[in-house]
Each structure stands twice: as structure tokens, then as C-alpha cells.
Curated annotation (Swiss-Prot):
Compositional bias per record (Acidic residues), positions renumbered to this chain: 54-64, 84-121
The keyword Zinc appears for this protein: no
Residue positions where Phosphoserine is found in the record: S10, S50, S52, S58, S60, S62, S64
Biased composition (Basic and acidic residues): 25-43
Gene name of the record: UTP25
Protein name (record): U3 small nucleolar RNA-associated protein 25 homolog
Family: Belongs to the UTP25 family.
Species this chain originates from: Homo sapiens (Human)
Function noted in UniProt: Component of the ribosomal small subunit processome for the biogenesis of ribosomes, functions in pre-ribosomal RNA (pre-rRNA) processing. Essential for embryonic development in part through the regulation of p53 pathway. Controls the expansion growth of digestive organs and liver. Also involved in the sympathetic neuronal development. Mediates, with CAPN3, the proteasome-independent degradation of p53/TP53.
Classification via InterPro entries: P-loop_NTPase, UTP25, UTP25_C, UTP25_NTPase-like
Pfam families xref list: Utp25_C, UTP25_NTPase-like
Length: 756
């Protein structure tokens, strides 16, 4: 019996976890949590934890079986005992330390760190954070998440406390804010836009109507193309002097805007106008509810200036829309009306979210929210209520110490990659009079701020069980900021988003259909949606989105200034630039035509050992993979660096290329965008395709002077282009030269830079 008892005891010990063994050793008994109770299933009892607790430890699947809850458990659940939580944290740390120690022992014995990786993998599969992320259908695909950005997202939090406080259905317009006179004014742009009723004939004619276009010239914006598929096209003149009262701004924006925007106003301009000249022209277009494409927004120059003005437009739109709803709530409560009066109160969409702001990084989302707070607060001594502000600053802010102090990069790089550059996020914001609710559930939000990847993971794809895009059904204002960066992230996410905008929702989501506008019920929301698109360059893919998905009845305004001098003028080294034009029958055949031209015409010239130290710059990752496979097949002496290359691989490739051990270096544009390393040892340069960013051309060319060993006379630069690269070519060589090169009978053109 003794042996049998000791054997059963040892078996019992073997089944215990490290935490259980530690508790047994310290206290002489198992923790009550692990008491073996009757296996008879009992109805689970829910114990409410105190609201002061910021986080709750989720039990694993094996421990989540329904058990009888003793009075002791209920007591533990209600106690605010911090010491026990700290004790558990210490136990977890000790457990992690033991795992690390075991791994170090294995390393010393010649073993690998596979055990640590397996342990981390096991933990990651159990964590709810990674379970949520596994829903990403493209999480493993190439081009999904570029380097320099976080590939994980913290467990999604939504504010459940302030639902009734920010509800549009149960609140009424406060008398102190008043029913703003601008809402009653017939000339108010907001009311003119949302109250305009389209006719069925006009909608049907859009499919067949040709697009009418007017060309305008404004002092600051320059060349504008104003187009519309609706018959009536009213041209408008550039603004002269703007009075804030004439803009129909909702309270308190008239008083708060001047202070919020003061950093951009200086000298005599400060007293005369509350806008900069650029802001003045942009806001006139925004306030007219026309679509806008502005391709000259740069992080280094005017990025913040533009962010301020579109945030003003967003808050103005939301305050007016919510004031209309709350005012109608008050009217419905104060007066008796019959069934026929319901149409007087149609003031909403099918879902509550009205504004979607797409930004690339968390830092941009942080700045947008800070501007919202500033615009609602202003000089007022009475602070506005911002729920979950501390959590938001913790998740979207950044620690200055995280950035290496000795990191030297170009100014434009520093301006783009500032702060928290995680690119997987989404957050709902609700605004009610002078209060802001951060982390609002999407269907209780007025404004959604998200990255393309953050939206992609919730929208999902065809055939997925968990997907949701109903919250996009009633978006009235879409802002896509820094659109050029999405070309470097994953442009497919932007296209996926646009394909799901303003579709009829699959669920009612508790909407009162008697309050829904008729044009929303008719599924005409896309004709009322205003889209503001900001980027740093003219690109065919961005132009395509604007032309295809922007069908606002008010018309579209696109800024189309042509570059007179190209980025080639910033090349400082003495270098011959040979531009070789290739012929392609159509746009679809360009990719194959370029590859065949390069393999048959260009590459044979560089196979000789004399033409060593050749860097091949490749904008497209798919072209990079194709060339890499070809080089391997042909057994060429080459190395490569792309956005997915490990740091050690990058160091080896740079070393081999500098020493001449590898003749060719395949180099992707996205790696250059995210890292901006200076590649030393370049003597011959090939641009497989013109760069997306024109200033990358001069940056890459100027790398040749990084190792100046008296070889300037042998340096070469070859550029491939076709007639379909007109925009990129104009940005590099200037519009006049580009036109000559595209129309010329000659296929080869030579430029020489750096001549003394």
C-alpha cells in the first residue's frame, strides 16, 4: 500500500505545473484554484471584477471547463488584492527565467535555441492577441507588412462604459450650444449637400454620361482639373479674403481654429487671415463638398498644414451632423406629430460612422486626435472630456529613447518615420458636443481612424466567416492621407477598402429607418461621399483610384502641376545617364517586355568581369523575384537585398558587393524606402524601372561618390523606360525633355550630370 501510495503521489506531482509545485512547496497545499471538484457540470457563475482593474488574466482552454465555484472563489473575485496579482507576475517571470536558463544551458552544450522558439510559439498560439491576428488572410504573403513596422497588434480594446453618454438616440441638444444658426441658413454647404435630392434619371445617366472637364488656374494650387459626370458643372473662383463667419463653422470652431492654426501664421498674415494661402484654397474646395486629389503633400514641407485644415473640415462636418440629429430628437420630444411628418426628421445614414480617415502610422492617428481635442477645446478654460486618453497615448505614442541617437538619415525620411510607426491599427472616435470618446465601438463611432492593414484585417475576404464592412456603408467623408506610403506598404489593401465603401449593410444594426435619409436607403451614398486624397507624387495607381472610385455629385478637383525640372538636376556626381526606351504593345505587356529587353539587350553588356560592381535598382518586388530566379538559373555571380532580407544578410551582401566578390547587387525600392542605407562600391547603375519617388533617382546616383577611388571615368548609369512611364519620366528629367524623349524616333537618349 505504501508503494502504491507513493507511486500515485509521484504521478500526481508529475501532472502539476511549475506554478502548482511552487505553491505546494511554499504553502504545503495546492492553490484552491486547482481543487479537484465533482465532474458533474454545473451552470457557470459569472463574478464581476472591480472596474478599477485595467486588465484581466484570461484562463487557458484547459482551465476554462465549467466548475463549481466555491464561496472562497467568489470572495477572491471581489477582493481588490494587488499583492496576489504581483505574486503571480513574479511566478511568471521566474518561469520565463527558468526557460531562458535552460536555453542558455542548451547553447553551452552545443544545442540550438529551438526549445525557446517552440516555447514562444506555443505561448503565441495561446494568446488571444495572436488568435485575433491569425484572421488576417494575407498575413503570410509577400508584400504584406514591410520592415520597420510592427507585425502584431495589441489586443483590441473598445470602450463599453460610455455608450449611453455618447448615444445619438437618447441625447438631446443642449441649450447652451444652441441650434446653430448656420444649420438653419439655406446657404450652409453642409445642408445644401445632404439635403440635395438626386433623381433616378440622373443616377442612370451617370453610367453613360461623358465626363466634362474644366481647366482652372489658382494662385497657390496651380493647375486644377475640375470634372463631373453630372450635367451641371459650376465653376468656382479662387478665394480672396475669407471671413470665418462666412464659412458656416459650427461652434466652437470659429474661436478655436485661430489658436490651433497659429503655428502656421506669421507676420501680417496672422492678423488678416486665419488660414495660410494653401489652407485657404484647400478649405474652399473641401467646404464645397467636392472630391479633391492633391499630389503635393510632403511630410517635410506642408504635411501638418494640410492635416490641420482637413481636421477642421472633419470636426465641422461631425458637429453639424450630430447637432442636426440631436436637434431633431428635441423636436420629436417636444411636439406631437403624425405618421406623415416622419420625413422631416430624416437626418442619418444606415450606420453611425460618417468619417473615415486612413493614415499610414499610429503617429499620424495620434496627431489627428490631438488636433480634434485642440479644435474642441481652444482657449476655453473648461476642459473637454476625453475618455480613455491615457490608454490612447500609451498605445499610439512613442518613447523618444527608443530611437537611436546616432541614426543619420535624410530629412524627408526623418519626417515620415517619426514617432510610433506601427501600421496595424484601427480606432473609433465618438464626438458629442464637447466630449470625445476614444476606442468607441465602430457602430457607435462618428469617426474611424485606421491604417489600410487595420481595415483589411476586419473587412476580410470572400469566403471568410468573420468579416465585417457594414460600418463603411454610410461614410460621408473619406480622407486618404499620405497615399504614396501605401504604395510602399500594400496597395491591394487600399483597393480592397475602396471596393467595400458605401455598400448596403448586411444587418440593420438597430437603425431607426424612419430617420434614415432617402438617398442612403436608395444605395446612393457613394454619390454623396466626399473623398479627399493627399499624396506626395503623381502616380498612375493613385490616379486610377481617384478616377474610378470618386463619383461625388458635386464633382472632382485634381491638382495637376507638371514638374518643369526633374530630380536629375540634383545628381551631384559626374555621370552619363543613358535612357533606353523599350517598346510595348499595351500596358498589360509592359512587365514581360521590360524583362525580355533587360535580359536580351542590357544584361549581356554587363556580363563581362570589367563591368563589376553593378547595382540593379528594382521598384517592384515581383520583378525582383523574377530577376533573382533568372540570375540563379544562369548561375550569375550576384547578391541581393530586399525588404525581407535579414540584417545579417544585408551586411554580408553589402560587404561582398563592396569587395567585388559579387558582380551584381539586386536592390529593391521598398528596402531603400524603409532603410535608406548608403550602398558603397557602386560603379555601374541600372534602373530596371524608373523610381516611384523621383528624389530616389538622385539619391541612388549620388551613392557612387560614397567610395571615390578615382574611377569616375568608368561610371555608368542605364535607365529603362516605356511610353507608359510618362509621369515618372517627367518627374526625373522634366516635362519638356520627357515629351521629346517619348515622341522622338530615337530609342536612346544621353544626359550627363556633374559637368564643371
Amino acid at each position: 500500500m505504501g508503494k502504491r501510495g507513493s507511486r500515485s503521489q509521484s504521478q500526481l506531482l508529475n501532472t502539476l505545473t511549475k506554478k502548482q509545485k511552487k505553491h505546494l512547496r511554499d504553502f504545503g497545499e495546492e492553490h484552491p484554484f486547482y481543487d479537484r471538484v465533482s465532474r458533474k457540470e454545473a451552470k457557470p457563475q459569472i463574478c464581476q471584477l472591480s472596474e478599477s482593474s485595467d486588465s484581466s488574466d484570461s484562463e487557458s482552454d484547459s482551465e476554462s471547463e465549467p466548475q463549481q465555484v466555491s464561496g472562497y472563489h467568489r470572495l477572491l473575485a471581489t477582493l481588490k488584492n494587488v499583492s496576489e496579482e504581483e505574486e503571480e507576475d513574479e511566478e511568471e517571470e521566474e518561469e520565463e527565467d527558468s526557460i531562458v536558463d535552460d536555453a542558455e544551458m542548451n547553447d553551452e552544450d552545443g544545442g540550438s535555441d529551438v526549445s525557446v522558439e517552440e516555447e514562444m510559439a506555443a505561448e503565441s498560439t495561446e494568446s488571444p492577441e495572436n488568435v485575433a491576428l491569425s484572421a488576417d488572410p494575407e498575413g503570410k504573403e509577400d508584400g504584406e507588412e514591410p520592415p520597420g513596422t510592427s507585425q502584431t497588434s495589441p489586443e483590441e480594446f473598445t470602450d463599453a462604459k460610455h455608450e449611453s453618454l455618447f448615444s445619438l438616440e437618447t441625447n438631446f441638444l443642449e441649450e447652451e450650444s444652441g441650434d446653430n444658426s448656420s444649420l438653419k441658413a439655406s446657404q450652409d454647404p453642409f445642408l445644401q449637400h445632404v439635403n440635395k435630392e438626386l433623381k433616378e434619371k440622373a443616377i442612370q445617366a451617370v453610367a453613360t454620361n461623358p465626363k466634362t472637364t474644366h481647366e482652372l488656374k489658382w494662385p497657390i494650387l496651380g493647375q486644377l482639373f475640375f470634372s463631373s459626370k453630372f450635367q451641371k458643372l459650376e465653376t468656382f473662383k479662387p478665394p480672396k479674403d475669407i471671413d470665418l463667419k462666412s464659412l458656416h463653422l459650427q461652434k466652437p470652431l470659429e474661436s478655436t481654429w485661430t489658436k490651433t492654426n497659429s503655428q502656421f501664421l506669421s507676420g501680417p498674415q496672422k492678423s488678416s487671415s486665419p488660414f495660410t494661402p494653401l489652407q485657404k484654397e484647400l478649405f474652399l474646395i473641401m467646404n464645397s463638398y467636392r472630391d479633391l486629389f492633391y499630389p503635393e503633400r510632403t511630410a517635410l514641407k506642408n504635411g501638418e498644414e494640410i492635416r490641420h485644415v482637413y481636421c477642421l473640415h472633419v470636426i465641422n462636418h461631425i458637429l453639424k451632423a450630430n447637432a442636426q440629429v440631436l436637434g431633431n430628437n428635441s423636436r420629436r420630444r417636444s411636439q406631437k406629430f403624425g405618421v406623415g411628418d416622419d420625413d422631416d426628421f430624416r437626418d442619418q445614414g444606415l450606420t453611425r460612422p460618417k468619417v473615415l480617415i486612413v493614415v499610414p502610422f499610429r503617429e499620424a492617428a495620434l496627431r489627428v486626435v490631438q488636433l480634434f481635442i485642440s479644435l474642441l477645446e481652444g482657449d476655453s478654460k473648461k476642459k473637454i472630456i476625453v475618455s480613455n486618453k491615457k490608454r490612447f497615448q500609451g498605445e499610439y505614442g512613442s518613447d523618444p529613447e527608443e530611437r537611436p541617437p546616432n541614426l543619420k538619415r535624410p530629412e524627408d525620411y526623418e519626417a515620415v518615420f517619426v514617432g510610433n510607426i506601427d501600421d496595424h491599427f484601427r480606432i473609433g472616435v465618438a464626438i458629442l458636443q464637447r466630449s470625445i470618446r476614444l476606442y468607441a465601438p465602430f457602430y457607435s463611432s462618428d469617426i474611424l481612424i485606421a491604417s489600410p492593414l487595420g481595415l483589411r484585417t476586419i473587412i476580410g475576404g470572400e469566403g471568410e466567416k468573420k468579416r465585417d464592412f457594414d460600418f463603411l456603408s454610410s461614410i460621408e467623408l473619406l480622407i486618404i492621407d499620405q497615399a504614396d506610403i501605401y504604395l510602399m506598404q500594400n496597395w491591394e489593401h487600399v483597393l480592397h477598402l475602396m471596393n467595400h465603401m458605401n455598400l448596403l449593410p448586411l444587418d440593420s444594426h438597430g437603425v431607426d429607418f424612419s430617420r434614415v435619409r432617402m438617398w442612403s436607403l436608395n444605395n446612393w451614398s457613394k454619390y454623396y461621399r466626399q473623398t479627399l486624397l493627399f499624396g506626395a507624387l503623381q502616380d498612375a495607381q493613385i490616379n486610377s483610384v481617384f478616377n474610378k472610385y470618386c463619383v461625388n455629385m458635386q464633382g472632382q478637383v485634381a491638382v495637376r502641376n507638371v514638374p518643369m525640372t526633374g530630380s536629375i538636376s540634383h545628381v551631384l556626381v559626374q555621370l552619363p545617364h543613358v535612357f533606353q526606351r523599350m517598346e510595348a504593345e499595351n500596358l498589360a505587356s509592359v512587365i514581360d517586355a521590360r524583362f525580355n529587353f533587360f535580359v536580351n539587350k542590357i544584361l549581356p553588356q554587363y556580363r563581362d568581369a570589367v563591368m563589376s560592381h553593378t547595382l540593379i535598382y528594382i521598384p517592384s518586388y515581383f520583378d525582383f523575384v523574377r530577376l533573382r530566379n533568372y540570375f540563379k538559373k544562369e548561375e550569375l555571380n550576384f547578391t541581393h537585398i530586399c525588404e525581407y532580407t535579414q540584417k545579417s544578410g544585408v551586411s554580408r551582401a553589402r560587404h561582398f558587393f563592396l569587395q567585388g566578390e559579387k558582380q551584381f547587387l539586386l536592390f529593391t525600392e521598398r528596402f531603400h524606402f524603409y532603410k535608406r542605407y548608403t550602398i558603397k562600391g557602386i560603379r555601374n547603375l541600372i534602373f530596371y524601372e524608373l523610381p516611384t519617388y523621383p528624389h530616389f533617382y538622385s539619391e541612388i546616383c549620388n551613392m557612387l561618390r560614397a567610395t571615390n577611388r578615382g574611377e569616375e571615368a568608368t561610371w555608368t548609369c542605364t535607365v529603362l523606360y516605356s511610353k507608359y512611364d510618362a509621369q515618372r519620366l517627367a518627374a526625373v528629367v522634366g516635362v519638356e525633355r520627357a515629351a521629346q524623349m517619348l515622341q522622338s524616333n530615337k530609342n536612346v537618349h544621353l544626359f550627363i550630370t556633374g559637368e564643371k
